[in-house]
Amino acid sequence: MAIKKAKRKSNVEEVKTQLLEIKTELKDGVFTFTGPMTINEFSKKIKKQAKDVILHFFKQGKMYNANQIINEEEIAELCLEFDYEFKKEEQITVSNFMDTLVLSDEAKDLEERAPIITVMGHVDHGKTTLIDVIRKSKIVDTEAGGITQHTGAYQIEYNGKKITFIDTPGHEAFTQMRSRGAKVTDIVILVVAADDGVMPQTKEAIDHAKSANVPIIVFVNKMDKPNKDIDRILSALSTLDVVSEEWSGDTQFIYGSALKNQGIDKLFDAINLQAEILELKANRNRDAIGTIIESHLDKGKGSVSVLIVQNGTLTPRDFIVAGSQYGRIRSIEDTNGNSLDAAYPGTPVIVTGLNYVPNAGDRFIALSDESFAKNIAEQKAFVDKQAELISRNTIVVQDGIKVLNIILKADVQGIAEAIKSKLLEIKNEEVKINVVRSSVGAITKSDILLAQASNAIIFGFNIRATGGIKTFAEESRVIVKTHTIIYELLDEVNELLNGLKAPKFKEVVTGEARIKKIFFYSKVGNIAGCEVISGKVTSGTKMRLIRNGITVHEGILDSLQREKNQAREVLKGFEFGTHIKKFNDIKEDDIIQTFEDVQI
């Protein structure tokens, strides 16, 4: 007899709510904004004269005009001056929502989960041998040159408690990969050889752990060696702010030998103690969220990913998004190859079903709304494509710093100068901005040719590129961006510096149909007999059911039936029959409205 699955809390509504676009507006005495703007823009939003705002700054000895860009501190200052409260909001997009997403769980739903451990250390300090002992397998012998070449995840059980381990590579070539590993990690095990001490990768591992605010347990390995120097290790680590408990610090130090299987149980005890202090908990009664640890393409299985569930439960047939990839989970196995019906918080598993290979370090989320999930993944794919285009428009200069070349066009000189000034204030450690040209007027072929020659991106403010110029730019492989709000232009430049720019979409109604009659069919439920009253209705599109002017359901329109034949679309004035997926409560005179999200 099949076990009935408990209903899990969906992630969809929380994601949709947090992806809502933040509006700059004054509402109920609170001014909400996302970044800098001109005095003119601020004045319009609060329905004041620009001269009143200019006067405020004049009294401070600042000679501002209506085109002056004011920063966040000045906006806050003005709000206080005009007796408004203010609120600075971060704009959340598909580019960053997985990093900022907040999932709410009630305390009663939370239960203890397995800690996730990353083992780090300098090459040849015995990190892989320690992992080998933990896994009770012989992965060491199969690795090239004795150095781990990939990231894996494994789970063991000690004293009735599960512990998950991530094995991150231990040398400089994989520093970025190791950094990704720290994002999912609860505790870092830092392996230091007793006969070698603190080395370059030891310091890097400490930096990664501290930047991720992850506690460290030090495993001093190779204690069986005759030439060990423990005091030197304790002293060197203390200068890196890793101070042992025996030196009145708060870091646990375990002494042992992975090769001799010594100190391993003490290490497990230390992990369980640290996990208790951290109070690691999760809600298994919700849809899953977690991190991709590694992935590859298998000829027989397609995309195969090793992932760790950090919250919720993952089951076969769940639809997930991981970076710009998506798909329905076909199979779940533990890291020993055993088939699983479900993966719970803290569990590493191997899954198949994604449309392509996600990146190691990508966050994943299960979304029960398949259409919404695909939309997010497709937008993220667009972001990635833009990032690739942007990378082609950067020049690597001395010391590895990249330059983003920009050609700026605006409708008036004052605005052009103000935007240029703000652009040059933008700080980024890896990329700097170079304004190749700043001028007034429409975008011309001369601008396109200069952009092509200098690998620049063209930004226009309060101007439009004509059809001919757009075509010429596309043929020349030059990116042209236009804006009418300054802070949006600045925000986009900031995103471009990180290789990110999410596309904007608007909803377009494609058709409406009135339900004239309802038929019942035992295999599917209610069938709606409809007539198209405007536009056209297409099968498989998004739809909403409207009753007396109120939306009562949103979903997907199933296949369309005209007489005895299936139809892809039905035009105005024609009749058809259809079924609304997972919804039966339809009535005569209800309106079926179909729509699609169109990129702006």
Swiss-Prot record:
Residues 146-150 are annotated as: G2. It is found in: Cytoplasm. Keywords: Cytoplasm, GTP-binding, Initiation factor, Nucleotide-binding, Protein biosynthesis. Residues 221-224 are annotated as: G4. Residues 112-279 form the tr-type G domain. The keyword Nucleotide-binding applies. It holds the Pfam family IF2_N. GO terms for cellular component: cytosol. The keyword Repeat does not apply. It comes from the Bacteria. Residues 121-128 are annotated as: G1. Residues 167-170 are annotated as: G3. Belongs to the TRAFAC class translation factor GTPase superfamily. Classic translation factor GTPase family. IF-2 subfamily. One of the essential components for the initiation of protein synthesis. Protects formylmethionyl-tRNA from spontaneous hydrolysis and promotes its binding to the 30S ribosomal subunits. Also involved in the hydrolysis of GTP during the formation of the 70S ribosomal complex. PANTHER family: TR-TYPE G DOMAIN-CONTAINING PROTEIN, TRANSLATION INITIATION FACTOR IF-2-RELATED. This is Translation initiation factor IF-2. It comes from Mycoplasma mobile (strain ATCC 43663 / 163K / NCTC 11711) (Mesomycoplasma mobile).
